[in-house]
Regions:
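NAD(P)-dependent short-chain dehydrogenase/reductase
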Residues: 59-104, 108-110
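Amphipathic alpha-helical segments that line or abut small-molecule/effector binding pockets
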Residues: 109-117
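Residue-level signal for the nucleotide or nucleotide-sugar donor/cofactor binding architecture
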Residues: 2, 41, 48, 103-106, ...
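Mid/C-terminal beta-alpha module of Rossmann-like enzyme folds, strongest
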Residues: 114, 121-167
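Helix C-cap/helix->beta junction micro-motif
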Residues: 16-17, 64, 148
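Catalytic helix-loop patch of NAD(P)-dependent Rossmann-fold dehydrogenases
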Residues: 5-6, 20, 29-68, 72-75
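NAD(P)-cofactor binding segment of oxidoreductase domains
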Residues: 1-22
Length: 174
């Protein structure tokens, strides 16, 4: 509900001042059952309350907004998977990550200019914005560890069913 209400309030504020709304959403609006990358016009089917609330936010943004769906966001500022892995690789002998969920990492240094371009260029509608190439969390973490000079063999593959504790919001597998 918060994801819908906050977007509705932003849309109303934008309407009052004549600003264009760019709303960032997520791949959680899909169920992950396709074996290919999702397209903007694919039907949504969220698996979790979070995904449903993000979809409600997309609807609350209205038809004149720019909706940008992204995934696996990481960058120099704020918390993200890359920073978590870099911390854990020095604290733990092994790291276990799921090999049965795939997605596209998205770097903020690439996403931010695109959001600006979409927001100022008169674009409306739904856009998917990620970096190229899909990987599993397991593959992504192995690459992070290797790039940081660590041993990628310290990263062990597990399945989503093996996660302990289970994730609070079911994540689409693709």
């Amino acid at each position: 509900r918060d994801n819908a209400d906050s977007v509705r309030w932003l849309r109303e504020a934008c309407d009052l001042i004549g600003a264009h709304l760019v709303h960032v959403s997520t791949d959680y609006v899909f169920d992950g059952m396709l074996d290919r990358a999702y397209r903007e016009d694919d039907p949504t089917n969220p698996l979790s309350v979070y995904g449903a609330s993000k979809l409600a936010g997309e609807l609350a943004a209205g038809p004149d907004a720019t909706l940008v769906r992204t995934s696996w966001v990481c960058g120099a500022h704020g918390g993200n998977m890359v920073k978590t892995v870099l911390k854990f690789m020095h604290e733990r002998p092994t790291l276990s990550f799921v090999a049965d969920q795939r997605g596209c990492p998205t770097f903020t240094a690439d996403l931010a200019p695109l959001l600006r371009r979409l927001g100022t260029g008169g674009f409306t509608g739904v856009y998917h914005a990620t970096n190229r190439g899909a990987v599993s969390w397991y593959e992504f973490v192995r690459d992070i560890v290797a790039a940081a000079g660590g041993d990628p063999e310290m990263v062990l593959p597990i399945t989503t069913a093996d996660l302990q504790p289970p994730r609070p919001a079911p994540r689409p597998a693709n």
